[in-house]
Regions:
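Binuclear metal-dependent hydrolase catalytic cores
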Residues: 1-140, 153
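Cap/insert and terminal regions of metallo-dependent hydrolase folds
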Residues: 129, 136-140, 146-201
């Protein structure tokens, strides 16, 4: 994914300066299920291979420090090979600075404020959504979640709601065990419609 993004930047022949890899400085993870963190090694290492010279800041739930450390340990042979002179490489760009978060403001600069909030992803205790607030926009990213009263409280006056959803029609075709799982961990299209009606993004 990172290489496809970089191909659209001017450095690699594209037309979008916003997609220069040095602009990827921070990443916010909602939870550490594999389907939401499997690409983390790409995000950590590929920008470095392509020239990033500063660490990546990671924000996410407990366990993220171990995950990031294990990724760099798993690729130690590759990292050492590149640092030993097989290609231009620096000793900083593959590193991470990890903040394991709780609910509240987790990042702020002159352009944006990022607030993490607990959502309702079944029995997973450390699962978050994020509210991004700039000078002219409020954007809420739900993460994986069933209907969440806490999310609704953070969604007040958002301009854009990015929310997960499963098909209520498709749900009818699932076996009972999958129905139990989806109802506890995710949001149906019907419930999302009711939520959107309530918060009016």
């Amino acid at each position: 994914v990172v290489r496809r993004i970089s191909a659209m930047s001017p450095t690699w022949g594209g037309d979008f300066p916003q997609l220069e890899l040095e602009n990827i400085k921070h990443a916010f993870l909602t939870h550490i299920h594999s389907d939401h963190s499997g690409g983390l090694s790409d995000l950590i290492l590929s920008p470095w291979v392509l020239g990033r010279d500063s660490p990546l800041y990671l924000f996410g739930p407990k366990g993220l420090k171990d995950m990031a450390s294990n990724i760099t340990n798993a690729y130690k042979l590759d990292i050492d090979y590149r640092l030993d002179g097989s290609q231009p490489a620096n000793e900083f760009g593959y590193k991470t600075i990890v903040e394991e978060i709780s609910e509240g403001i987790v990042f702020k600069d002159t352009n944006i404020e990022v607030t993490a909030f607990y959502n309702n992803h079944g029995g997973l205790k450390n699962s978050f959504g994020y509210l991004f607030v700039s000078k002219d926009k409020r954007i809420l990213f739900s993460g994986d979640t069933a209907v969440s009263t806490n999310l609704i409280s953070y969604a007040n006056k958002v301009d854009i709601l990015v929310h997960e959803v499963f098909s209520s029609e498709g749900f009818k075709t699932k076996t009972d065990d999958w129905k139990i799982y989806h109802e506890a961990h995710h949001t149906s299209s019907i419930d999302l419609g009711l939520l959107a009606e309530k918060i009016q993004p």
